[in-house]
Amino acid sequence: MKKELLKLASKHGTPLFIVDHDVIRKNYRTFKKNLPRIQCYYAVKANSNQEIVKTLFDEGSSFDVASYNEFMQIYRYIRHFEEKAKDFYIWDKIIFSNTIKDMQTLRDIKKYRPLVTYDSEDELKKIAKHCETAGLVLRLKVPDTGSQVEMSSKFGAEPGDGYNLIKKAFDLGLVVEGLSFHVGSQCTNFDNYTTALSIASEIFNHARKKGYNLKIIDIGGGFPVPYDSQVPKFEKLAAVINSEMERLFPSDIEIIAEPGRFMVATSAMLVSKIIGKARRGGKIFYHINDGVYHTFSGVVYDHWIPNFSSFRKGKKEVCAVVGPTCDSFDKISVSEQLPGNLQIEDYLFTENIGAYSIASTTKFNGFDGAKILHLNN
């Protein structure tokens, strides 16, 4: 693998973000195999690269979008469909999972009659005024203890308010199709899922008894990626979810999920180049041509700890790897085990960097983002 990476870096330049679409296909099929009852809605926010979206579209994935622009990314593939097929696709294959939408977005999507989430009475009033054609899914606040990125501090209605928010929606002339939750990104605490499913089932059953025919449960994302050997196996989580769904929910409802990281994290690696070397405070600093304002933005926004590997062998020591910008904040890692004999112009590579990386790249200091190379697309 190293020889091939060196060839690609030499040919295309660095930083080079390499995406293997066969890995994306494998991840999608693994998800479907282990959770056969669940319809997969890829969370576009994880990596919105159009080639990646196209691969998942071709695999049959549905999509979780957060904005009008993300919606239009998917719409471009169905623009040529007959009207009935187009309407069905939007209704069955796209969900606006952002619980807060500005009024213009609601007006823009009204004609498409999409499925949208909400978690407050004020959002209901906006939807009733500007997008009454939408189907609704109530987002619930659930525990996210132990997840890499928590969600519940910003999103989700308190479970105790759940039924009233369903009733309020119907009182406004809207239709609530189901419930959703998110246990936090990169969730390795499987109790979060069992607790969330239990919370959702109580509200679901209460609403049905009151005559509100809910028929969708959206279990969100959070499916863990094997960044290291300590991460529990996805197959183990899938078994837990399958068992709880069978126990708690009737067989006639639709179960959906919003995996993002799970689909793309392991599909990409980055080759970067050492552009400077210095010893500071007794520690070697390797300055590379990518950083936290670019492909390593996940260090900041995603609480992700990257791994670096070198092509040159040597005695390892604790080093710092920092980005190219003039901001001292641009430190990727200050405790990386790397050979101390690496030289300027040597390459480093980082695996499992497909999610929440190029999605939040900036042009800070005038530095461009990594070149993107697609394999097997």
Predicted segment positions?
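Conserved, mostly hydrophobic/aromatic
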Residues: I24, K45, S67, I109, ...
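ATP-grasp fold ATP-binding core
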Residues: G135-K141
